[in-house]
Amino acid sequence: QEAQDAYDRHQRDLDRFNRSIWERPGEQVALEWVSEWVGNRAREGYRVIVVDPITVCRPSAQPWIDDHKFVTSAEHALSTCNASLLLVTHSAKNRHEIDMDSIAGGHAYQKLSQSILLLERHKPPKEVTMVKPGIDMGRFQCEINETIHICKARKGKGQGMSIGFIIDWKNLDFAEQGVILKKGQ
């Protein structure tokens, strides 16, 4: 019932947002198609463009070249139209480390991105030591079920930090808990 109430409160905004969602064609598409689609949305005036997931694109014979072409082509379209692109990807297979190499896709995404955020789910919830920057609370223990790792922050602070969250998917609610301290801090 709480989720329905939240939907009712935000229905107008959600309906407006829904008109800005496209589905890919039924078949897998090439990165060139996605690049053209991103450019078209940017020229139409969309400020934030999201591709979720970029890893669903048709595999190519030369992914390192095609990834680089895609990123540079998208970057050109976005910069001329003052738009931003969010690419959603997944963890690379058989990788358990939390770093830029743990994301699926080529190095072009790592090298040419402004920011890389990695979402880590904790099932069961994880106990961590945290601080809240700017609030004199000191260290505290907290149980979280999601972590956002800031793997790259080219034009901002926070690279290498991790932020703990409690997300209640049933009620579509979340609460930031603070910055997770690394062991030994």
Place the predicted regions along the sequence by residue:
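Flexible beta-alpha connector loops of hexameric P-loop NTPases
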Residues: 22-28, 58-68, 97-101
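Conserved P-loop NTPase "ATPase switch" module shared by AAA+ and STAND
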Residues: 44-60
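Short, conserved active-site loop motifs that form the nucleotide-linked donor/cofactor pocket
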Residues: 16-20
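Structural recognition of the conserved hydrophobic beta-strand(s) that form the central parallel beta-sheet
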Residues: 50-52, 83-90
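C-terminal regions of RecA-like/P-loop NTPase motor modules
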Residues: 4-14, 28-49, 76-81, 94-185
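A short alpha/beta connector and helix-capping loop motif
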Residues: 63-77, 84-85
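Conserved helix-turn-beta segment of the N-terminal RecA-like "Helicase ATP-binding" lobe
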Residues: 1
